[in-house]
Design a protein with these regions (language model features):
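Metal-dependent nuclease catalytic cores that hydrolyze phosphodiester bonds in DNA/RNA
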Residues: 1-140, 180-182, 193, 274
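Short acidic (Asp/Glu) and glycine-rich catalytic loops that position anionic groups and cofactors
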Residues: 25-31, 143, 184-195, 236-237, ...
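Short, polar/flexible loop-turn hinges at active-site or ligand-entry regions and domain interfaces
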Residues: 33-41, 60, 149-153, 171-175, ...
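Hydrophobic/aromatic-lined pockets within catalytic cores
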Residues: 56, 60, 147-150, 165-173, ...
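Mg2+/Mn2+-dependent nuclease catalytic core
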Residues: 106-219, 344
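Active-site-proximal structural scaffolding
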Residues: 125, 157, 228, 267-273, ...
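Short, charged, low-complexity amphipathic alpha-helix
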Residues: 205-276
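Extended, charge-rich alpha-helical segments
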Residues: 272, 279-371
Length: 371
């Protein structure tokens, strides 16, 4: 957990933010000028990563992480406010992947868990924490555990994992002749038990050469701003970035198009350019409200009280008074089934599957437009 925090605090060109600064070099320094905030989802992910680390260490290094020590560590994690029992099942999926990956080697591989990796040869003062690194023969395997479920992450051309691979090749060059690289992401909450992409030493080194040029620009805060859905999604400067605002607002140029009805080719262009417009607008509104509430000024806007709601001051006492007046609970309360996901969360994924696997079907979702 500490290593993750250090990366956020000190690595300007961090591996976890590489998908931003490699696409939009000036964004690294721009983000540096803004306060970093941690969402509840990120905090939840930190707990899940700590649990995954404990389990992996117990399996690969039981002398250092005995069952007793593991139990004590997990008991401590369970006291965290955002702890959820379903983390146990999801981290087991990750551990199963690590076990399977390790036995693919002809002999026992070297395994590093939560390894701090420097790739300073490619990006100045760049480092990050790799969840798991395995090396055996001439094969390097970088494995990353993702606890998020909102956005599925692919290992293919994944800059975070590729930077870890470059750093690992430098660190272990004197011991291993690495020629083959595997990059894997385990993201169980999206239904992904493990997705692997493979590349050669030549391919990863070519990526590294490209990184050197872009990272030099990013370090100096130079280069061109390049707004886009992927790099802007989690950028701290995303809602106030001038380049992004101008890119999105250029959609208003439609009035110059003739004839009055746009073609489907033009519609496709607007769909691409408008991707992220609503999310950006809502984030901008939130930032403006925070500015006003903190004493700042946003011309033409003010903060007002939202819609009022009524709440009980003493719910139990209120219901007792209503019961005494002749209104039973059957009138005052609703009874409804929990959703399948809620029931699975209570019962546990494994037991739920055993009890109800033949009684649950997946209905096709409504059609959705994707690029």
């Amino acid at each position: 957990m500490t290593a993750v925090k250090e990366e956020r605090q000190h690595a300007l060109l961090s591996a976890s933010s590489a998908h931003r600064w490699l696409e939009c070099p000036p964004s690294a320094r721009l983000e540096e000028s803004l306060p970093d905030t941690t969402s509840s989802a990120a905090a939840e992910g930190t707990i899940a990563h700590a649990l995954a680390e404990i389990k992996a260490l117990n399996y690969f290094y039981p002398a250092d992480m005995s069952k007793q020590k593991m139990s004590r560590r997990i008991a401590k994690l369970k006291k965290e406010e955002l702890w959820n029992d379903e983390m146990q099942g999801y981290t087991d999926v990750y551990l199963d992947f690590l076990k399977a990956a390790s036995i693919e080697y002809p002999s026992k591989p070297y395994v590093a868990i939560e390894k701090t990796i420097s790739y300073d040869n490619y990006a100045r003062e760049g480092f990050g924490t790799a969840d798991c690194i395995m090396i055996g023969g001439n094969t390097l395997h970088v494995i990353d555990f993702k606890y998020g479920k909102g956005v599925e992450v692919s290992p293919e051309n994944n800059p975070q994992l590729m930077l870890y691979a470059l750093g690992a090749m430098d660190v272990y060059a004197m011991i291993y002749d690495i020629q083959h690289i595997k990059l894997s992401i385990v993201q169980p909450r999206t239904g992904n038990p493990g997705w692997t992409w493979e590349l050669s030493k030549e391919q990863i080194l070519l990526f590294g050469e490209n990184v050197k040029h872009v990272s030099a620009l990013a370090w100096e805060g130079k280069g061109d701003y390049n707004p886009g859905p992927e790099q802007c999604r989690f950028c701290r400067a995303g809602d106030l970035c001038r380049a992004r605002a101008e890119s999105l607002m250029d959609l208003e140029a439609a009035e110059n198009m003739l004839p009055p009805l746009i073609t489907w080719d033009e519609a496709a262009m607007y769909l691409r350019r408008g991707n992220g417009l609503v999310a950006w607008y809502n984030k901008l509104k939130d930032s403006a409200l925070k500015e006003i509430l903190s004493g700042g000024r946003v011309p033409g806007y003010k903060a007002v009280s939202g819609r009022t709601t009524r709440v009980w001051t003493d719910r139990d006492k209120a219901f007792q008074a209503l019961n005494d007046a002749g209104y039973p609970d059957t009138v005052l309360r609703e009874t409804k089934d929990l959703s399948i996901s809620q029931i699975e969360k209570i019962v546990g994924k494994k037991e739920f599957t055993e009890l109800a696997k033949d009684l649950v079907v997946k209905q096709p979702g409504a059609p959705a437009l994707v690029p």
